[in-house]
């Protein structure tokens, strides 16, 4: 039966423990998530370049009234002592309400997405490139904070998608598990829009080039986290994209829905 409550909360770690934190991210993506389908984690690294500060956080979720003593051991003491941890048995709605209240309104945001195989060296290089380039390019932008989140994607998760009706995205399950990553930039002033968007493009491009050079990259781009200009449908296999175009042409031959829906990614334009 579905749990009436779940174990959920956010742990925060000091930047002096960054290597241990990244070890935990790797181990959960490679071993923890595939081993226990009740467990999920959202590891997010937030950096504030004007303050020369980086914060390491992990939202932990376990879908059971009974907690697992081992699945998050790499994010708890003594392996990795948090400076704060709200992980507890509670209704999911209570957790969502508490975290939603922390989100400020009125700020400007940009997103980009990346994907890679689960590799410890790749995680380190992604982290180092992101932190160093945000610091060098955006330290003078008012209110700038940036984050990168490693979202673990398991082989079983992808297989269930295939079993329920195909794999239009063409994700190569044989290479799973993956990290589908989201980069986020938040800032204050409209006058900084161009600078932040340009930096976001450059940082993402540089990380992708690094991943491709060392065969860490994965082609799929997760639309929900993508940013303006990213070629989402073009990351699908060519045959799948052609099929999607045929389906679109069959059900919207006059492009009524295609043209009336403002913005976003369009199969017709891919």
Predicted regions and their residues:
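Soluble FAD-dependent oxygen oxidases
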Residues: 1-270
């Amino acid at each position: 039966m579905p749990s009436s409550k779940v174990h959920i909360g956010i742990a925060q770690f000091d930047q002096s423990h960054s290597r241990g934190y990244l070890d935990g991210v790797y181990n959960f993506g490679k071993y923890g998530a595939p081993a226990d389908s009740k467990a999920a984690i959202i590891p997010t690294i937030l950096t504030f370049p004007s303050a020369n500060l980086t914060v390491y956080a992990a939202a932990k979720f376990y879908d059971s009234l009974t907690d697992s003593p081992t699945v998050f051991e790499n994010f708890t003491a003594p392996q990795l002592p948090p400076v704060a941890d709200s992980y507890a048995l509670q209704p999911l709605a209570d957790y969502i309400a508490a975290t939603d209240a922390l989100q400020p309104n009125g700020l400007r945001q940009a997103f980009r997405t990346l994907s890679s195989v689960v590799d410890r060296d790749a995680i380190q290089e992604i982290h180092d490139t992101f932190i160093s380039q945000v610091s060098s390019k955006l330290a003078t932008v008012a209110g700038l904070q940036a984050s990168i989140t490693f979202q673990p994607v398991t082989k079983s998760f992808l297989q269930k998608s295939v079993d329920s009706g195909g794999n239009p995205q063409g994700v190569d399950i044989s290479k799973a598990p993956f990290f589908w990553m989201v980069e986020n930039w938040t800032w204050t002033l409209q006058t900084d829009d161009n600078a932040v968007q340009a930096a976001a493009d450059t940082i993402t491009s540089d990380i992708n080039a690094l991943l491709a050079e060392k065969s860490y990259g994965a082609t799929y781009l997760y639309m929900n986290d993508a940013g303006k200009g990213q070629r989402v449908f073009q990351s699908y296999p060519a045959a799948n994209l052609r099929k999607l175009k045929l389906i679109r042409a069959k059900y919207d031959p006059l492009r009524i829905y295609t043209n009336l829906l403002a913005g976003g990614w369009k199969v017709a334009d891919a």
